[in-house]
Amino acid sequence: MKTLVLLSICALLSVCWSMGAVEPEVVVDTVADTTADAAPADPAAAAAPSSSSSESSESSESSESSESSESSESSESSESNSSSASDSNSSSDSSASDSNSSSDSSSSSSSSSSSSSSSSSSSESTESSESSESSSSSSSSSSSSSSSSSSSSSESSSSESNSADSSASDSPSSSSSSSSSSSSESASDEAAKVVVKRDLASVLLRRRRAAPGGDLTPLQLESLREVCELNIACDEMAETAGIVAAYVAYYGPVPF
């Protein structure tokens, strides 16, 4: 169904172009005509170009009016065809876009062929108008391309800013989690140190068989001092008397 509609639209457009319904508009450059009329110095030579320029202006005006009416009729017919095609194919967006692109390319080719055929018979004013039209179309295309590039650059910058914001929002959470974990680890280390100090004192006192009053022999004191110096947990209780006093104060007198 889509192919049939496309073929029918192409056939109608080709018939319209073959009949000469679509032709470019002719714009008369009055400034060029006045300069061309003022150039010759002889009155006879000036009269001949002026009459020819007036005839060319009249013919160009009549051709412009007829071509504008024909182009408006052809545009109305093409619009009606495109509207009927879009109504019949409301669900097929791709076919409509294909038909639009094909109609645009065919219209550009037909306009170029008709402009080439008319440029051979028209004057320099039509050529200047065609060049101005082509320059305006190129400027419009360049403006559209620049707008599209600016929109794409703005989208990329917004996406980059979003990613930067997300990374910035992620970094404080990671730093806070790392700080909380380090604080919990330090607290557990301190608790472990306290436990190690207490257990070490009790084990050493039991192994050395301290006296009931808590007094130790010089040999036992020396051995305890050496052990505490090697152990990192005995940083504040390097003295053996301090270890024994802490044990006695916490656990009471030594039971053995």
Swiss-Prot record:
GO molecular function, one term: hormone activity
4-carboxyglutamate, modified sites: E222, E226, E229, E236
Keyword terms of this UniProt record: Biomineralization, Calcium, Disulfide bond, Gamma-carboxyglutamic acid, Hormone, Metal-binding, Secreted, Signal
Residues that bind Ca(2+) 3: E222
Location(s) in or outside the cell: Secreted
Region (Disordered) location: 38-193
Residues cleaved off as propeptide: 19-209
Domain (Gla) ranges: 218-252
Binding positions (Ca(2+) 1): E229, D235
Lineage top rank: taxon: Eukaryota
Chain residues that bind Ca(2+) 2: E226, E229
Primary role: The carboxylated form is one of the main organic components of the bone matrix, which constitutes 1-2% of the total bone protein. The carboxylated form binds strongly to apatite and calcium.
Family: Belongs to the osteocalcin/matrix Gla protein family.
The protein's name in its UniProt record: Osteocalcin 2
Organism: Diplodus sargus
Lineage of producing organism: Eukaryota, Metazoa, Chordata, Craniata, Vertebrata
